[in-house]
Amino acid sequence: MSTLFLNARLLNPAENLDTVGSIKIGDDGLIEAVATGGESIPAKAEDNVIDLAGKVLAPGLFDMHCHFREPGQEYKETLETGSAAAVAGGFTGVALMPNTRPVIDSPLGVAYIRHHSAGLPIDLEVIGAMTVESRGEALAPYGKYASYSVKAVSDDGTAIQSSQIMRLAIEYAANFDLLLIQHAEDKHLTAGGIMNDGAVSAMLGLKGIPEVAEPIMIARDLQLIAWLKKHKLNGAVAEPRYHVAHISTAESVALVRKAKAAGLKVTCEVTPHHFTLTEHDLSSSIEKGNFIMKPPLASVENRDALIEGLRDGTIDAIATDHAPHAKHEKECPPDQAAFGIIGLETSLGLTITELVDKGVITLSQAIELLSTNPRRIMGLETILFRAGRKANLTIIDPDCEWIVSESDFGSKSRNTPFMGRKLKGRALGIYHNSKLIMR
């Protein structure tokens, strides 16, 4: 049975498309026809016709930074429940970080994820570890990753501390055209820290994490990349592609902005919790465990710098760093809480509420940040609204107002600081892999 979406706002930044129109999809999942500019697509009696007047059809959202905990910590999340969380948030694909148990640092680990994700409603891209067991001591087999069509490497959560190992990672990743995703953290500065270092941490009696721990690592990496580009590469290998995960400070944004101006292939992402919350939200909350994450929630000034980075295009993507934890790991004193929160179900709503509605970015730019750019950065195929192309769509109601509640989550975990928060904008469903899934 074919599916016919009528009267939707067709919004696809990759095609500079923003107009009211209709899309018909065959039962094979391929787009049969696209109508805009007052044109119409005739419906057949057997078609599944859905009127989307006032709603948006966008390219399927893609989150390039998620943790689904499988293998090894299935009590927090599984590939199946993580995928359910993604669908609830309007995502048709995500990229999975390798810090599972065991770490995904070999083709065997990649094969495990692909085998166990077969039949799930979304696409799962596997990110390989930068180093063996993410210990920062010896490089993982980048050549074998490439042969398994892995697109990126990261030691997320345990940034490479050795400059020599990082230099090798940059060179080898460039040779195999792998994106380097850096969790920028100087562990010598952050050891034992719980939240942003400053007056608020002192007031709460919690050990602080100095904000300089992030830009120090970014500056080191960018210096290495610039040096290798000038003195070592000489066209012998591809230029490194470097991506900063969950950027959180003004200085980090400034470094990325400067590197882009210098012509380096540098991109970065920000999480909804970092452009929405600050350290003061932690201090005023009773349930502080759900405000503990890395990098920590920072000052108002740093949060505002992130918003400006989104406004001027320095920040390329919005990613959730979806990090599920069990109830007992978060409902505890803050200095005992696990780092991280879930984010797939609330990402779109926070983006529209905090950025689009406040005039920081347009809805089209939001789709770029949530879909077009993450796919481009990861080296994935661009989604186009054209006949013959595979339909990969997210259905959005940008005006829907809703209160975040437990019933909204597909995730196995509930560790969010946004429970009870009023948001505007919500995914109503997805069309992907020849299947329509509506909320």
Curated annotation (Swiss-Prot):
Entry-linked PANTHER family: ALLANTOINASE
Name by which UniProt lists this protein: Dihydroorotase
Keywords for the protein's UniProt record, in alphabetical order: Hydrolase, Metal-binding, Pyrimidine biosynthesis, Zinc
Cofactors named for this entry: Zn(2+)
Example of a GO MF term: zinc ion binding
The keyword rRNA processing appears for this protein: no
Role of this protein: Catalyzes the reversible cyclization of carbamoyl aspartate to dihydroorotate.
Entry GO terms, CC: cytoplasm
A single GO BP: 'de novo' UMP biosynthetic process
Pfam family, one: Amidohydro_1
Cofactor note: Binds 2 Zn(2+) ions per subunit.
Binding site for Zn(2+) 1: 65, 67, 156, 321
Annotated family: Belongs to the metallo-dependent hydrolases superfamily. DHOase family. Class I DHOase subfamily.
Pathway assigned in UniProt: Pyrimidine metabolism; UMP biosynthesis via de novo pathway; (S)-dihydroorotate from bicarbonate: step 3/3
UniProt-annotated catalytic positions: 321
